[in-house]
Amino acid sequence: MQISQAGINLIKSFEGLQLKAYKAVPTEKHYTIGYGHYGSDVSPRQVITAKQAEDMLRDDVQAFVDGVNKALKVSVTQNQFDALVSFAYNVGLGAFRSSSLLEYLNEGRTALAAAEFPRWNKSGGKVYQGLVNRRAQEQALFNSGTPKNVSRGTSSSKVTPKYKVKSGDNLTKIAKKHNTTVATLLKLNPSIKDPNMIRVGQTINVTGSGGKTHKVKSGDTLSKIAVDNKTTVSRLMSLNPEITNPNHIKVGQTIRLS
């Protein structure tokens, strides 16, 4: 599963936004910017936009999304997942993995798991109102209803594969590695305005590599391809973001099926 915009908004509401680089403590090695993004990639006089700050936050949160996914052994709703990611992002993955909250949840005792949120209201043994407020909102989100559970491992919703940029990478090289195009990567990553401006450590959306494909033949339509391969048009369009109109595919075009 991936965190929703509602989950991102919850985290943003508690992290606070700074568009100029700063040091909370003068002796800190690196600068901080955006929603608490800290590291060697932040320069002393750097200034960013609110959109760039959210993109940085999403990159930072991704490790916690992955960590929560790995720790869960049961089905959860999107709201529950968002609350868990916010919680893990705040307390740390180690604390989340060893928590009674996760233990109860994986045992199927959801009500007991929800009751654990308010206990995590201290830092250094002292209760902080900010943590009380955050836990209350996470608990409320966790307990709020959604239309249906999202089954782990069998969900029909697509989780976009991720790739972390390494030293020496460029968008052309990444596209080739994942059997796709730079244009497709740019559509999957609207925050990338310049294909020559990606940074080491950045997490970008990619298409799955090595999956099943179909080369469009004369007489093919997206509906026919979907039926022949026991899938749906919407699923094919999500796998092929370069297809913006299901009625416009061309002979010889390669379409990803999985």
UniProtKB/Swiss-Prot annotation:
Pfam families: LysM (PF01476), Phage_lysozyme (PF00959). GO terms for molecular function: lysozyme activity. GO terms for cellular component: host cell cytoplasm. Keywords: Antimicrobial, Bacteriolytic enzyme, Cytolysis, Glycosidase, Host cell lysis by virus, Host cytoplasm, Hydrolase, Viral release from host cell. The active site is at E15 (proton donor/acceptor). One of its GO terms (biological process) is peptidoglycan catabolic process. Belongs to the glycosyl hydrolase 24 family. This is Endolysin. It comes from Bacillus phage PZA (Bacteriophage PZA).
